[in-house]
């Protein structure tokens, strides 16, 4: 086992604080509308330029192992805030740095670290309740656009695009961010249900100019099995040909003789058919087939429930107004399924979302809800260079998470004002002893830190602005972009309550643990190995 280096008491805490300060100082230059960028070197390709706090934090690794431990613990604050709300990572880092610095001063002055932590925790619990009381719902498009704009570093086009996307696919809809091809940002909305499976044969294409298959008012056959024998398909094909409508087959696979016969029938114009593979794998495929059946008013032909393809009738088929299939995707538009059945299916999936344990499962279930309930919106980010594209994409992602958080828990006045109002309301909060009271004061003083940092990044004097804002009440605050005072809500400077709450809770959680640290243990750096190249040579 490798030898260890151990540091105790003040020696350990000073080293740890130095690491905290290096990471926090690198992150906090990005805070606010006039925050600066950070350039991150990459082992290959062009450097990345970012104004996203968590991206900066993730890159920092220090040489001194004790300092690095401090930095890594604050990195955890930024990551947790990012996971919970998708934004507020820089605010969380600034809060953590302030609580740790003030808390360690109090420990050095002889306060009991455990009581300090209890005081900090008490202040944070009370602050979260006050934040909830200050919160107002965020329901209209204007407020959603304002939240998106602030989170995307005052980029109004991004805020408007996100509001428009939410308008079109609903607040539960899936909104994804992709690289665009031009210089402008674009919004692309896919209505209906789209899944990532294309046609099984290019011979099905009936719109050569777009390379797509378009079927008007088709019957939709859903089969949870491989189809390779054309005999079991004949009754269905004959019934569809009599009805004079096209047919879409969605099955585990269609191959061999069956696929060849379908292609020949299509080319001769006997019956218009297209076949695609069912989306997903295993249990997820079964669930998605059932989703499509609900949407189109059909039945999944599955041998598990004793149904045979040969006995399928037109009553078992789903129907839709239109289906568009290209090389990679299939889109079903306006399925004829009953609204009550669709809502019941959506409620069932939502229940599964609540019980899901992994983020991946939750995300996939959320996508299924969106496909059934609304649609999918894609924001295509435009930029002149790849470096700018990466930076902008990160900002749009942040803005998207922030707007979702705002819809979920409401909004409070932005620019650090909400935390200052909370701190002033809690000025009479007391603990069980004097050390706890100091802990409460440490937490309340830290709540001023985000506003002070925003002002500092503007090149103004933090104390002057902080005192002016404290002298006001309600939503009165400082607009750092225009350098004016006024009502933050009226000026459109909003922060999602969830983002502010998560930042405060995670900062206090990690900072409290660091204040109560008395000993740090790490591996000793390995010394230079002796040069043995000439060992054993004769004299």
UniProtKB/Swiss-Prot annotation:
Enzyme Commission numbers on file: 5.6.1.7
InterPro entries documented for this protein: Chaperonin_Cpn60_CS (IPR018370), Cpn60/GroEL (IPR001844), Cpn60/GroEL/TCP-1 (IPR002423), GroEL-like_apical_dom_sf (IPR027409), GROEL-like_equatorial_sf (IPR027413), TCP-1-like_intermed_sf (IPR027410)
Catalytic activity: ATP + H2O + a folded polypeptide = ADP + phosphate + an unfolded polypeptide
Domain of life of the source: Bacteria
Keywords, alphabetical: ATP-binding, Chaperone, Cytoplasm, Isomerase, Nucleotide-binding
SUPFAM superfamilies noted in UniProt: GroEL apical domain-like, GroEL equatorial domain-like, GroEL-intermediate domain like
EC class name: isomerase
HAMAP family in UniProt: CH60
Purpose of the protein: Together with its co-chaperonin GroES, plays an essential role in assisting protein folding. The GroEL-GroES system forms a nano-cage that allows encapsulation of the non-native substrate proteins and provides a physical environment optimized to promote and accelerate protein folding.
The protein's name in its UniProt record: Chaperonin GroEL
Organismal lineage: Bacteria, Pseudomonadati, Pseudomonadota, Gammaproteobacteria, Enterobacterales
Gene: groEL
């Amino acid at each position: 086992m490798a030898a260890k280096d151990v540091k105790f008491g003040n020696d350990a805490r000073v080293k740890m604080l130095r690491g905290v300060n290096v990471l926090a100082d690198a992150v906090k230059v990005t805070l606010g509308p006039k925050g600066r960028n950070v350039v991150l070197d990459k082992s290959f390709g062009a450097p990345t330029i970012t104004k996203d706090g968590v991206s900066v934090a993730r890159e920092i690794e220090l040489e001194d192992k004790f300092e690095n431990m401090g930095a890594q613990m604050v990195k955890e604050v930024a990551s947790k805030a990012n996971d919970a709300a998708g934004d507020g990572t820089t605010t969380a880092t600034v809060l953590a740095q302030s609580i740790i610095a003030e808390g360690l001063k109090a420990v050095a002055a002889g306060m009991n670290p455990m009581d300090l932590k209890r005081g900090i925790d008490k202040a944070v619990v009370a602050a979260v309740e006050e934040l909830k009381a200050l919160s107002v719902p965020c329901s209209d498009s204007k407020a959603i656009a304002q939240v998106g704009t602030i989170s995307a570093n005052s980029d109004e086009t991004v805020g408007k695009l996100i509001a428009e996307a939410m308008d079109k696919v609903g607040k539960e809809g899936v909104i994804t961010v992709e690289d665009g091809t031009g210089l402008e940002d674009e919004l692309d909305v896919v209505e209906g249900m789209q899944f990532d499976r294309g046609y099984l044969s290019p011979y099905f294409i009936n719109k050569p100019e777009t390379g797509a298959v378009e079927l008007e008012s088709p019957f939709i056959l859903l089969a949870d099995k491989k189809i390779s024998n054309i005999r079991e398909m004949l009754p269905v094909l004959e019934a569809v040909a009599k009805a004079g409508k096209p047919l879409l087959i969605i099955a585990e696979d269609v191959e061999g003789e069956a696929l060849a016969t379908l292609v020949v029938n299509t080319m001769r114009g006997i019956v218009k058919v297209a076949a695609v593979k069912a989306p997903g794998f295993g249990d997820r495929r079964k669930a998605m087939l059932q989703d499509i059946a609900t949407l189109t008013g059909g039945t999944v032909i599955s041998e598990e429930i004793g149904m045979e393809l040969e006995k399928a009738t037109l009553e078992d088929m789903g129907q839709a107004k239109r289906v568009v299939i290209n090389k990679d995707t299939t889109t079903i538009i306006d399925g004829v399924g009953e609204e009550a059945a669709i809502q019941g299916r959506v409620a069932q999936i939502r229940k599964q979302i609540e019980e899901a344990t992994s983020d991946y499962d939750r995300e996939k279930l959320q996508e299924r809800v969106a496909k059934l309930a609304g649609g999918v919106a894609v924001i295509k980010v435009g930029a002149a260079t790849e470096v700018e594209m990466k930076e902008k994409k990160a900002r749009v992602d942040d803005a998207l998470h922030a707007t979702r958080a705002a819809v979920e828990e409401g909004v409070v006045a932005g620019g650090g004002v909400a935390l200052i109002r909370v701190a002033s309301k809690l000025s009479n909060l007391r603990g069980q002893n004097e050390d706890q009271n100091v802990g409460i004061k440490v937490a309340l003083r830290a709540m001023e830190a985000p506003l002070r940092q925003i002002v500092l990044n503007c090149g103004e004097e933090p104390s002057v602005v902080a005192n002016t804002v404290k002298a006001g009440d309600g939503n009165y605050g400082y607009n750092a972009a225009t350098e004016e005072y006024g009502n933050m809500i009226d000026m459109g400077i909003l922060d999602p309550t969830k983002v502010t709450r998560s930042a405060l809770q995670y900062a206090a959680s990690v900072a409290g643990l660091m204040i109560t640290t008395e000993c740090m243990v790490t591996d000793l750096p390995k010394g230079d190995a002796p040069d043995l190249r000439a060992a054993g040579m004769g004299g």
